[in-house]
Amino acid sequence: MDTISTFARRVGLTPSALRFYDDCGVLRPAHVDPDSGYRYYSADQERDAALLRALRQAEVPLADITAVLAGDPASAREVLTAHARRLRSRADTAHAAVEAALRMVEQPSHGEVS
C-alpha cells in the first residue's frame, strides 16, 4: 500500500485531488487508518486513477466518471460516447461562432472609406 503522496506522484494526481475524489466517492482509498485518518492506495487502483485523470482532462463530469469506473465496459462506452457527442456539438457551435466573428471582422465597417 502506498501513502497518498506516493500514489499521487505515481498516477499524476495531487494529494488534494485524491482527497477530493475520495470525498466525492469517485476514487476511495483502499484503506484509511482509523487513528490517523491517513489514506492508503493499492497498486490495483492505479488504472482507475489514470483513467480518472484522463477523463477529467476530457472534461467528463464527475457523475459520469463515477459511472465509468463503477460500470461494465458496455455502460462505460455508452457514457463516453454520449460525452464525445456533447463535446463535438460544443466544438461545432464554437467553430461556427468564430467563423461568424471572422466574417464580421473582415467586412468593412459602416461609414469606412476605402
Ranges and model annotations:
Residues 40, 113-114:
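Solvent-exposed, well-ordered amphipathic alpha-helical segments
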Residues 1-61:
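Basic helix-turn-helix/winged-helix DNA-binding cores
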Residues 65:
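Hydrophobic positions on the alpha-helical face of helix-turn-helix-like DNA-binding modules
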Residues 69-113:
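Short, charged amphipathic alpha-helical surface segments
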